[in-house]
């Protein structure tokens, strides 16, 4: 099987500040976390896991044949949870790339994940992440994250505000991170930063500490479920497609 040195980890915390028991919310007939796992699993990566603090989430994934790693509930971010899970993967010395797919993207396309893997392997960035070009009018602030990049596509800043100011076309950030193993290990050794806490964006810890994030342009714009309104949009999308 290709990509034997890659692990995909989907961190899924039961309690969310903005949407109660978010992973267990139904979209159509199945839960949010089940939809995410099924989409990610289409990438056909052997080392694909859900990392969770919830037995209920674990049982849902196990029932559909998925692999689960149970983690503590007091882990600060999804990437920190990803690393805790990575340490528990058997024979993880053979894994050199870790893909963190946030557990709130129910319609993520597996081809975006595969593109990230290839881009990570063939670049010199510490971390890579996908972005999509969108019109300013089509994206709302607060529940969406945009990124400003340099001419080479290196990320300069991420924000829940629309950046850069005045631009008609923006880069919408998708919640997937491709880490080199040493970059992930460095990330979790660093303390949370002021900007990370202010924007509630863990990737700012990376930038504030001088590490590099490369952006990879993809075409799909999946819905990210962070609020009740996002959930309604996801349910509507599921019903219509």
From Swiss-Prot:
The keyword Nucleotidyltransferase applies. Its main location: cytoplasm. It is found in: Cytoplasm. GO terms for cellular component: cytosol. It catalyses: 3-deoxy-alpha-D-manno-oct-2-ulosonate + CTP = CMP-3-deoxy-beta-D-manno-octulosonate + diphosphate. Activates KDO (a required 8-carbon sugar) for incorporation into bacterial lipopolysaccharide in Gram-negative bacteria. This is 3-deoxy-manno-octulosonate cytidylyltransferase. The gene is kdsB.
